Amino acid sequence: MFVRALSLRDFRSWDALGLNLRPGCTVFVGPNGHGKTNVLEALGYLSTLSSHRVSSDAPLIRTGTAQAFAGATVVNTGRELTVDLELNEGKSNRARINQSPTRRPREILGILQTVLFAPEDLSLVRGDPGDRRRYLDELLTSRIPRMAAVRADYERVLRQRSALLKTAGGALRRSSRGGGRPSEDGASALATLEVWDGHLAAHGAQLLAGRLHLVHDLAPHLAESYQSLAPESRPASIRYRSSLGSSLPPEFTAPARAPEAGDIAFLEERFLQELSVMRSKEIERGVCLVGPHRDDLELHLGDTPAKGFASHGESWSFALSLRLAGFALLRADGSDPVLMLDDVFAELDRKRRRALAKVALDAEQVLITAAVPEDVPEELDAVRFGVEARDTDRGRISHILEETEDRRDG
């Protein structure tokens, strides 16, 4: 898979960009803050419908405009598709495939598969569980695009159930102070809660089963990737930690356990069981304490948790290994994703640079950003684009300066 053409309009610092790309290695070179990363961010957004830098779409729309546009023509095993996405301030985003509008933007998921490694990825090791859940879900929907709908349904039900818990909790607190029965609203919320328990368990079981299957497939690639980057270090491993607690047998979340046909039904049953156990605590606190939104991906070096104990170099290697494992998994599924490396070579020592360059050389297409050409390993033959931002009366605008080809002897 490779991106043949990229178009941007009013995306971040780019007022207009039309870029033809090719398989192999392409490097965007320029000072920090001049718009290089915005190019990779746009492609990442077309791939995942989210940014690796911000949690909302507003910063992606260039200041002073109300709409941003990103489009890419993707070639995969000889088949060419063009995906377009409009980001609209205060309105729903719109997407097209080969100029035909889609009902929902998520219908473009799976057309462009990317794996992006950026400095922000250190949060995969050192950050909150939400960073690791997002990593899993983006990789999961890249492999199985229909899981985006499952995740959206789960989040919709979660919001509704959380609102009911707050209503029920507030009503019970007021009635206990007054020595009377729960209000009509509180009683209605309690009666409705059981219905939403069923919806939450149904969608949550599908999402949880998908994540567990993913971790099973991902684990050997992670161990291999980390070994190639840090052969002298302790072995790296991952394990899914579920909020279902004692309702779920420990062996069920073991990465070595192969998924089975009855997993979703089993998980739904255990989900409902744990919701029943936690009902009073959830009402008291007014939040949903059970479900995939409370889970984590545990990272270990040997028997030690990576978070809080790994050195800076080990943390970098683990974060990079998670991305490279995702790349290897998508490749094993049958198609090379586009590999994108955002200003990462400067952060790595010589050994890790060589290991990463080896993967990049083997990818069908790799897009790299660097502040200076010397940050890119010599063994990478690259097409290079210079990038510069200029101050104008319409704000700071990024431009492509020139295209050059580097053919250094490695």
Swiss-Prot record:
The keyword Kinase does not apply. It comes from Rhodococcus opacus (strain B4). HAMAP family: RecF (MF_00365). The lineage of its organism: Bacteria, Bacillati, Actinomycetota, Actinomycetes, Mycobacteriales. The RecF protein is involved in DNA metabolism; it is required for DNA replication and normal SOS inducibility. RecF binds preferentially to single-stranded, linear DNA. It also seems to bind ATP. PROSITE patterns: RECF_1, RECF_2. InterPro entries: DNA-binding_RecF, DNA-binding_RecF_CS, P-loop_NTPase, RecF/RecN/SMC_N, RecF_2. Keywords: ATP-binding, Cytoplasm, DNA damage, DNA repair, DNA replication, DNA-binding, Nucleotide-binding, SOS response. One of its GO terms (molecular function) is single-stranded DNA binding. GO terms for cellular component: cytoplasm. It holds the Pfam family SMC_N. Its main location: cytoplasm. PANTHER family: DNA REPLICATION AND REPAIR PROTEIN RECF. It is found in: Cytoplasm. Belongs to the RecF family. ATP binds at G30, P31, N32, G33, H34, G35, K36, T37. GO terms for biological process: DNA replication; DNA synthesis involved in DNA repair; double-strand break repair; SOS response. This is DNA replication and repair protein RecF. The gene is recF.
